[in-house]
Structures are given as structure tokens and as C-alpha cells.
């Protein structure tokens, strides 16, 4: 009988240790665990806040930019900027976490600034034909900018109460 109690105590401590580990992970890096739909009620305000941060950072004003949230299946894209109607489309099913949402929206806003003109679009397409998507300097600069600004944007979104993590 004494051996059974020892097993029960060991199992109890293993379960408690795993639970404590999961809570600790959720507290330390929640942006890599939760999806955007789980942590915010108003994605439009999140978009406007990210846009305002980028406008302040670059010292410019972006007029008439709209955003669409698409929940349909798409195997290739997380989002794209359409210069014809000056809009961003985000494929929400392809973004598992807050981190990927913020990075994608920042990249697409960056594209709306630097690829929105006819000459910018021609330059983008020229690079795309010559070196492909992964080596396109306009794509690379958008990705680097998004990575550099993630912590600042994430902090502002949390401070304004636009995203909140339930642990």
C-alpha cells in the first residue's frame, strides 16, 4: 500500500510541475501562444494603432488605407497589399499568433507606404522578376522593419488595453 501512495505523490508533483510550467510559459511569451482573435475585441483599433505608430516613426501620413480580414483558406499568404484600391487583406487562418499578426500587419503597412505609387510597384515587380520574393529588397526591408518595431508596437497595444492575455 505504501508503494501506491508514493506513485500517487510522484504523479501529483509531475502534474503540478507541468501545470506550473505551462502557466510560466504563457506569462513569459504569450504573443507566441495566443491568436489575435483570442486577445482582442477590436482588430480595427489595433490596425489604427499600428498605423499611427508607423506614421509617427517614419514621419509621414498614410491616407485612405483600408483593411480586410479574410477567414478563408489560403496556403500561400498571410497578407497582401493591393495598390489598386489601397487596401490590405489579412488571411486570419494563416496567422496562428499575435506575433505573426503584428508582424504581417506592419509589413503590409510598410508596403502600402513604399510600394503604393506606380513607380514603386514597377520597382517591386522588377525585383520580384529578377531575384524572386525571398531576395526582393523591398520585402526584406519590410520584414526587418516589422521585426525591429514588434516590441514597441506590442508594448503600446498592451498599454492601451487593445490586447490582453488571459492566463
PLM feature spans:
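Amphipathic alpha-helical segments that form well-ordered structural scaffolds
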Residues: 49-53, 141, 145-149
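Post-HEXXH active-site segment of zinc metalloproteases
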Residues: 99, 115-144
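Active-site recognition of the HExxH zinc-binding catalytic motif
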Residues: 103-116
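Long, well-structured alpha-helical subdomains associated
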Residues: 132-135, 146-167
